């Protein structure tokens, strides 16, 4: 794959600010530049960025309807009403339900939770779920990570005498559901200063407000932060602002004192002996929690996350791990099938989107397949399967393109849809699939930019190997946790060559272990280039080449720094 290297621009004014900032903080000007690229131009803001503080969290009562939500919850507890915590079946939804249930359960016992079945009920609030609430005497439902578009279902619940508090972060329609309170910073009448909370993050703010109203000290909320961090990392929300504070302290909690359920997941992931990062959550912890809702029922994930006995939690984590193995097998076979279909599509080179429909595909894995297609073909992708008489599916997007708007453009063809800029769910009548495919392609073709459909590596700064000192790496680590809006910095160095010891490694000989010399400084660095063994013949000629890379700690030799090489460009 030929990647285009895109160097992040920096103006003369920004360069000057970078130098000033670096001097004030006692860090490398290169790191000063990284701060400025992230919108941080003052030393005081940089210190808050490097050491996020929990007291800097926003007042939860700044959120529209928060006072109403807290009053209704307090009234329900005072009147001994039965409360149901209801949430989506993905990681964000199940962590949100676990968080709210665990916190309220410390003070109130007439409580239950409910996760809709992906296959029998589908996404969001279902009439079956409302009926369950009515049959079990529920007076108040707190719904998390869904509900913002459930006008019909919440009206149905209201007719049965059930009130709703919505805690959501998805984009609302013009007409809001008739809930008692709607906590969502994406409301048009939003009054909250941060709009990128995860669904679980909104649940946390609700519990923070509930704690304040009842004189419960903040330290009682800290044990919940490991769950919040998992939701933030898994739902791919920006890790800046309030999310950075929550993720930073949540990772500390995850590493030092995880909840019993999280500790069991950490054990089955084989992460007990290492410092857990956002990447570990995204690639190991999150997929296992998600597998429960994909393969069986998301309720099992909540059962695990709320478990108080570690031996039972380990058994439950083992079961969820098995679901993940099943998910991986389905993922592999469906992705292969999808790739074969796309490779044979007529006029693929001229298409700007991919829409696939196969009624045999497993509903729980189609979102993953859509993600794989965007990674390979650099186009927004929609993958659909059949559920009863409907085509239901998931959409994923490429960097910079709003797939939600593209789907919204086709709303008259849809029965239901919802989501974010980069991920959405949708359903339509099977007979509308062809019309949707055409209209979606038309919209994408008109709005996507050429650079959004090609493999691009965004390079933060050009450096020499001599810049990579132990202090530089120590200061660079302060940029953690990495994620959207604060991605792991990618550096490039021009004119490096093989020291003479570089070799191909890996079971299938697909990686290169490198020892490289920087032509400019003559400094030597070790590196690993995954999946790039095709370059080894050129490298062995001792001719110079350019590299772009992230800087990592060698997991096999603690304290040693190595380069994880993203791309190699021979110099012709």
List each model region and its residues.
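Short gly/pro/ser/thr-enriched loop/turn and capping motifs at secondary-structure boundaries
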Residues: 119-121, 150, 170-175, 189-191, ...
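Intrinsically disordered, low-complexity regulatory tails of plant transcription factors
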Residues: 150-151, 235
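Acidic-glycine-rich active-site phosphate/pyrophosphate-binding loop
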Residues: 75, 171-184, 516-521
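Generic beta-sheet signal
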Residues: 114, 144, 167-169, 183-185, ...
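Hydrophobic helix-and-loop "lid/oligomerization" segment in the mid-to-C-terminal part
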Residues: 2, 10-140, 160-161, 211-435, ...
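Short alpha-helices
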Residues: 99, 175-216, 221-233
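A short acidic, amphipathic alpha-helical/loop segment
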Residues: 152-156, 369
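Mid-to-C-terminal polyanion-binding domains and interfaces
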Residues: 75-79, 312-318, 322-356, 409-572
């Amino acid at each position: 794959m030929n990647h285009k290297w895109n160097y992040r621009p920096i103006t003369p004014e920004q360069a000057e600010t970078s130098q000033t900032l670096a001097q004030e903080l006692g860090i490398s000007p290169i790191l000063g530049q990284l701060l400025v690229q992230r919108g941080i131009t003052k030393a005081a803001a940089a210190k808050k960025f490097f050491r996020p503080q929990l007291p800097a969290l926003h007042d939860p009562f700044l959120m529209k309807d928060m006072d109403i939500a807290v009053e209704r919850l307090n009234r329900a507890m005072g009147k001994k009403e039965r409360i149901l915590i209801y949430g989506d079946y993905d990681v964000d939804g199940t962590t949100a339900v676990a968080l709210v249930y665990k916190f309220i359960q410390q003070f109130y016992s007439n409580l239950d939770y409910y996760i809709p079945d992906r296959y029998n009920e589908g996404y969001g609030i279902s009439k079956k779920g409302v009926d369950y609430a009515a049959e079990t005497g529920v007076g108040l439902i707190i719904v998390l990570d869904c509900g913002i578009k459930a006008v019909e279902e919440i009206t149905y619940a209201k007719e049965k005498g059930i009130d709703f508090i919505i805690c959501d972060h998805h984009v609302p329609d013009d007409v809001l559901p008739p809930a008692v309170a709607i906590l969502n910073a994406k409301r048009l009448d939003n009054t909250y200063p941060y709009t990128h909370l995860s669904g679980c993050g909104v649940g946390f703010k609700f519990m923070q407000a509930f704690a304040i109203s009842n004189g419960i000290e903040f330290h009682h909320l800290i044990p919940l932060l490991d769950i919040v961090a998992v939701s933030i990392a898994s739902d791919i929300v920006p890790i800046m602002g309030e999310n950075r504070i929550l993720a930073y302290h949540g990772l500390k909690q995850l590493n030092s004192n995880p909840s019993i359920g999280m500790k069991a997941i950490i054990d089955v992931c084989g992460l007990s002996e290492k410092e857990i990062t956002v990447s570990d959550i995204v690639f190991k912890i999150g997929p296992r929690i998600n597998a429960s809702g994909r393969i069986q029922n998301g309720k099992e994930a909540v059962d695990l996350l709320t478990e108080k006995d570690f031996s039972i939690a380990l058994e439950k984590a083992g079961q969820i791990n098995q679901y993940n193995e099943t998910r991986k097998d389905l993922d592999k076979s469906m992705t292969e099938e999808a790739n074969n279909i796309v490779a044979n599509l007529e006029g693929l080179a001229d298409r700007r989107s991919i829409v696939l429909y196969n009624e045999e595909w497993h509903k729980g894995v189609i979102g993953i397949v859509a993600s794989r297609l965007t990674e390979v073909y650099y186009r927004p992708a929609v993958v659909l399967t059949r559920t009863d008489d409907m085509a239901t599916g998931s959409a994923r997007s490429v960097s910079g393109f709003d797939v939600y708007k593209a789907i919204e453009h086709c709303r008259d063809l849809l029965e239901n849809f919802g989501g974010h800029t980069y991920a959405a769910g949708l359903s339509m009548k099977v007979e509308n699939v062809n019309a949707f495919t055409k209209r979606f392609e038309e919209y994408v073709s008109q709005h996507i930019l050429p650079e959004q459909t090609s493999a691009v590596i965004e390079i933060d700064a050009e450096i020499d190997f001599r810049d990579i000192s132990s202090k530089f790496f120590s200061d660079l680590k302060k940029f953690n946790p990495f994620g959207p809006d604060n991605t792991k910095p990618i550096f490039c160095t021009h004119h490096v060559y093989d020291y003479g010891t570089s070799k191909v490694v890996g079971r299938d000989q697909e990686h290169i272990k490198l020892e490289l010399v920087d032509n400019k400084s003559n400094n030597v660095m070790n590196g690993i280039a995954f999946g790039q063994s095709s370059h080894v013949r050129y490298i062995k000629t001792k001719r110079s080449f350019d590299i772009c890379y992230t800087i990592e700690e060698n997991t096999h030799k603690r304290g040693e720094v190595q380069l994880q090489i993203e791309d190699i460009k021979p110099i012709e």
